[in-house]
């Protein structure tokens, strides 16, 4: 997949996708508007504190990757930025409104369960139930031009699996699986040692009792 965004680039794209839907009268966004959106305290995970120069550098990189375009002139006193990430005239990535809502929220908040996504996308798209969110996630994970999301291993004690976008590259879960295997192996070794200690205690007790009788 040709979409390889850094975490900060993903934040900028997520903000533009979100604001295009939630505040269309303020979209496209200025440099200052994008900085405020990136550093927003709500609906962001992790919370970032990007400087204006950092945001400008990110915008310049995204322009080179053709994920953004600038709008200036015609009454605009400042340069405005709009995304070309999806649904642009000549772009290949086409997403439905529901898919845009899910992708934007994953870009802004990282891995989430379908239930969390349903709640957090409500300003961008209204899902009737969690199954609709799950269907969108299934579609995004099975697309021929994707996959764009992946189901993560369920965390211990959690009822739902989380999903993560793949626009920053593949998710490597092997370490988590290896850790689980190591934990299982360690548990087995401890159990064997406990049995051996118990047997030694029994043998020692038997020797002590025999010595007492002698």
Swiss-Prot record:
Instruction: Please give the Pfam families that the UniProt record associates with this protein.
Output: DUF480
Covalent S-S links between cysteines = none
Top-level taxon of origin: Bacteria
Please state which protein family the record places this protein in: Belongs to the UPF0502 family.
**Protein's UniProt name:** UPF0502 protein Spro_2794
Instruction: Say which species the protein is native to.
Output: Serratia proteamaculans (strain 568)
């Amino acid at each position: 997949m040709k979409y390889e965004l850094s975490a900060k680039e993903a934040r900028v794209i997520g903000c533009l996708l979100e604001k295009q839907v939630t505040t269309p009268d303020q979209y496209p966004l200025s440099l200052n508007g994008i900085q405020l959106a990136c550093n927003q305290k709500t609906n962001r995970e992790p919370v970032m504190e990007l400087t204006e120069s950092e945001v400008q550098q990110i915008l310049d990189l995204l322009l080179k990757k053709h994920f953004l375009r600038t709008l200036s002139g015609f009454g605009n006193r400042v340069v405005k930025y709009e995304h070309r990430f999806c649904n642009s005239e000549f772009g290949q990535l086409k997403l439905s409104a529901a898919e845009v809502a899910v992708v934007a929220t994953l870009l802004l908040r990282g891995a989430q369960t379908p239930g969390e996504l349903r709640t957090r996308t409500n300003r961008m798209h209204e899902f009737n139930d969690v199954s609709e969110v799950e269907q969108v996630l299934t579609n995004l994970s099975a697309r021929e031009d994707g996959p764009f999301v992946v189901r993560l291993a369920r965390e211990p004690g959690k009822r739902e699996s989380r999903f993560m976008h793949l626009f920053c590259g593949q998710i490597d879960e092997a370490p988590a699986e290896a850790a689980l295997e190591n934990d299982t192996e360690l548990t087995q070794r401890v159990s064997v040692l406990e049995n051996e200690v118990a047997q030694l205690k029994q043998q020692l007790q038997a020797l002590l009792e025999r010595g007492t009788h002698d």
